[in-house]
């Protein structure tokens, strides 16, 4: 019944506590946890594991190569590739998206941050950022600076602040079906063939 169908893809970047070589760690939070609870999750979910001694923003070329290979090998719709991550993965989301904005139909960084001077690279990419205002690990100003910089250059950005919430802004975000509906509302234009 799904022959010939091309699926939307979500690339999920985990937090620092899930680095290493044990894939079971990656399943503790975020998209992998949602997929385990929802067998009919309507996306191809890609959840790589960051090596122990590095951070996602240092893995940007590797992540790009991974995405390229997945799009080439599998039935993925290249106009519906979405990116999200929490904490270290939120930083990685900003870094990967600002480096390769043409890849993504929409992104959702959670309790992360980036380089505000690079934010305008995302002015054509819908962004929905999330952060708890009581986060003791990654201060909310990290997200605020990126959101403000993106707004200044006319970007399509939403910002959800969870009042009284600490570092775990991701459980509430990933358990909310509205996020996935929002992702699916966004699609990149088809690339014209030359």
Regions found by a protein language model. Name each.
Residues 1-5, 51-88, 101-103:
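Gly/Ser-rich "nucleophile elbow"/oxyanion-hole loop immediately N-terminal to the catalytic nucleophile
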